[in-house]
Amino acid sequence: MRNSILLLSICGLLVFSSCKDKEDKPKYSIPQTYNFTNANLSTSSIRLSMLAEMTAYIRTTHSNTDAPILNAEKLMNMYENINNMFGDSVLNNSGIQLKDKTSNAFGFRSRLELSFNDAIIASNNAAVKPTETSASSGYAGKLISGTRYILVDSAGIEYKEVLEKGIMGALFYAEATRILNTINSYDNQNNVNGATAQEHAWDEAFGYFGVPVDFPTNQTGLRNWGSY
């Protein structure tokens, strides 16, 4: 008898819990159309463009006919956005940089800055014989593999990938998640220049995804995370 009462009590609790869960589910309607006129992705978009220029600069060494030597100071200046090193004046005058938002988790930021100097040594080695592989185990330089000509460090790691993929994780992903994790701390009452601080924060976090504001309807110009 006692076991029967206990069993009935447990069943009753389960039914009650099930009903309560159903009652607590939020109700919402999905909009049929969206308005993106006040979307502002400028901060994150500028950082994506800065990375693109830095990556393109390193890629100038990825050739079997030419052997440009990289400049470590230029790479560092681009990273800190000083001395007008970008080809786009909008980037130079933006007051935005990559370094101040790059996470140093696992020592990445320090490792990246060291790689700028290492890349100079590798590009100098590659310049000696621009049409041949100069990289080998323990020796940085140019690696020719099929139709690919890439600048690698002494461990065979591509400098472009250290920069590009590293910033995608240590800045774009890290900053987007940091913003979203603290989204409730942003003001969502006062409208300034067409958006609240919280709305702008959402936009900035979304911008690090590297897609148009009306993605996935529009899939033009996908960059970084958005291109995967």
Region locations from a protein language model:
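Mature extracytoplasmic or organellar-lumen-exposed domains after removal of signal/transit peptides
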Residues: 23-228
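Sec-dependent signal peptide recognition
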Residues: 2-9
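C-terminal motif of bacterial Sec signal peptides marking the signal peptidase cleavage site
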Residues: 15-18
